[in-house]
Amino acid sequence: MNTRMILSLLMMIGGLALLLLITTSWAPARGVNNSTVGTVDWGRYTGSWYEIARKPHSFEKGMSHVKATYTARPDGTIEVRNEGIKNGKHKVARGKARTTNTPGQLKVTFFIFPGEYNIMELGPDYSYSVVGGSNGSYLWILARTPELNPATLNGIYSRLEERGYDLSDLLLVEQ
């Protein structure tokens, strides 16, 4: 085999591996119901939310005291400010969200990376929110206060398990 054939073969294998990685990480998780709530009053939803628990992922690894603040903008979008403490330093990420045709769903963009923000459960008084991504690997439990009533939190856990979520790796966030 000559060098050109070997390089072509390596590029083809690399391309197939990349395609496999993309399709498996972005595909909906089997058996997970991430359907959204029927309606959201976005005026009530804006404001500050404390992160109570989350599935682990790279962009929040090692973060504590995490809080998200949503602010309505005149153009109809929502400004997103996520902040927390990592290695003793205050970190802030800013993004923009817009509603979609699906009730209870936002498309949130940080830098150039868009993602689905599916509000799967919302407290009747907007005191807590359960948010998932496009697959079962993203999950957040948010509350208006740094702590959530244990009975409420246990009820959320039960309903998430009924939706097919594996909570064995769920992280409680230090506030």
Name every feature range the model reports, one short phrase each.
Residues 2-175:
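A beta-rich soluble binding module of mature secreted/lumenal proteins
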